[in-house]
Amino acid sequence: MENEKNYRPNVAAIVLSSSYPFECKIFIAKRSDMDNIWQFPQGGIDKGESAKNALFRELKEEIGTDEVEIIAEYPEWLSYDFPGKIVKKMYPYDGQIQKYFLVRLKHGATININTKHPEFDDYQFVSVKQIFEMINHFKKNIYVKVIKYFEEKGYI
């Protein structure tokens, strides 16, 4: 019996404010379809699309701008399983396998979460410590791992 999981390819962005590196504030947004769930922008990679192209497309779709510069990317793809209540909605996928990018908003870029298909109803730029306090869901371990990596490399 085969027990291999079916993961959806996905990109995620840790978006730093345009004041980086002078100030390290990270964008986090509150999902409009779940109660008090804050997360980084993320989304699926379309068939034939590169991870970087998906990154820019997803940022435009979710936060209204793709005016960012890539600072770094996490060296591995990270996977997680969907919790029970989400797995039904995301069928046939059991979870996601993600490529994380650290990006900085370009000067003059404007965030607009009132997009064509809004996924968020609020957002903030916060410190790393605040990120860890705000994340209370199944992706927390991955968020901690990725942020710690970028901290160790001296990016944040």
From Swiss-Prot:
A motif (Nudix box) lies at residues 43-64. Its cofactor is a divalent metal cation. Its EC number is 3.6.1.-. Pfam families: NUDIX. Keywords: Hydrolase. GO terms for biological process: nucleoside phosphate metabolic process; ribose phosphate metabolic process. It is an enzyme of class 3 (hydrolase). InterPro entries: Nudix_hydrolase, NUDIX_hydrolase-like_dom_sf, NUDIX_hydrolase_CS, NUDIX_hydrolase_dom, RppH. One of its GO terms (molecular function) is guanosine-3',5'-bis(diphosphate) 3'-diphosphatase activity. Residues 6-148 form the Nudix hydrolase domain. CDD domains: NUDIX_Ap4A_hydrolase_plant_like (cd03671). SUPFAM superfamilies: Nudix (SSF55811). It comes from the Bacteria. Accelerates the degradation of transcripts by removing pyrophosphate from the 5'-end of triphosphorylated RNA, leading to a more labile monophosphorylated state that can stimulate subsequent ribonuclease cleavage. Belongs to the Nudix hydrolase family. RppH subfamily. HAMAP family: Nudix_RppH. This is RNA pyrophosphohydrolase. It comes from Campylobacter jejuni subsp. doylei (strain ATCC BAA-1458 / RM4099 / 269.97). The gene is rppH.
